[in-house]
């Protein structure tokens, strides 16, 4: 089993091997700890495995079952292969290295009431009533001109922005993973979440291209959303806005 280390100074591309754990069965997606270092089990195989011939072996303890879903792990591997990049570059798009703080914030979540009723009534487009919907905007200007403040602040909606604090982002990660939020609205940089069960993706104005200085990986948003549609068996809808 290959592991990904959240320690910023760990080894080649922060990848290592899982040592003997006795009778404890470790599965891909599990979170483990060794000393003060956290590791994510990412699977029995790696993309570009020839680059990982001499890896360190560690024997960590299990700390969180199913910390990441299979669909998210599959997206990790696909992005590494498709964009010829590293696991380090891909994983950081999804999750912070401050795992202890992330785990602490899970226990502070507040239970939500009815998630969808008010949201569906206030939104003109078709949402997934039973599962999660991701709505992706090219920029905040388009988002704010296409949605009302009441909608963005609805109980069942997670509004994600690159301007939010790390604490806010961590809380949203848990809310999305645990299905406390049914509708996720965001710009391109925030699409990388560990969804509970994503069944609808709405891609708004895809003709607006995304650029980022020194961006790695240099992913194409449309390609990533299409792969997410495939992995989650979700519907992908493209919306064109005319002002």
What feature does the model see in each segment?
Residues 1-242:
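Accessory, non-ATPase domains that flank or precede helicase/AAA+ motor cores in DNA-metabolism machines
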